[in-house]
């Protein structure tokens, strides 16, 4: 079965989440450990997301810090929320043919699956704020 982009994003989330615990782990090994899929070959878009988020992580984290309310730091965020924000911000800025609204909607779908309703509202607000900043600068 071929994976669609939504499923690839879910698996990219899982790989990135696992790599937070062991940044030296091999992406292929982590990918193969994800349950519920028969694919052994990593989809190219998953590699784009995982490698892109890792490559730009410092910049993405700075941007996330800028989106937080005063008194909050990135260290206070739930780990799933942090991974979802990194993925969304990466897609908004670097992924080809992914409109901002799609990246935000996909982030909200990931939040429904991997986080909480409260987090969904937070992520929606943070990404909405980022989108507004981008639109104001263009």
Swiss-Prot record:
InterPro entries: NusB-like_sf, NusB_fam, NusB_RsmB_TIM44. The keyword Transcription regulation applies. Pfam families: NusB. GO terms for molecular function: RNA binding. It comes from the Bacteria. The keyword Mitochondrion does not apply. Keywords: RNA-binding, Transcription, Transcription antitermination, Transcription regulation. GO terms for cellular component: cytosol. Gene3D superfamilies: NusB-like. GO terms for biological process: DNA-templated transcription termination; transcription antitermination. PANTHER family: ANTITERMINATION NUSB DOMAIN-CONTAINING PROTEIN, N UTILIZATION SUBSTANCE PROTEIN B-RELATED. Involved in transcription antitermination. Required for transcription of ribosomal RNA (rRNA) genes. Binds specifically to the boxA antiterminator sequence of the ribosomal RNA (rrn) operons. NCBIfam families: nusB (TIGR01951), PRK00202.1-1 (NF001223). Belongs to the NusB family. This is Transcription antitermination protein NusB.
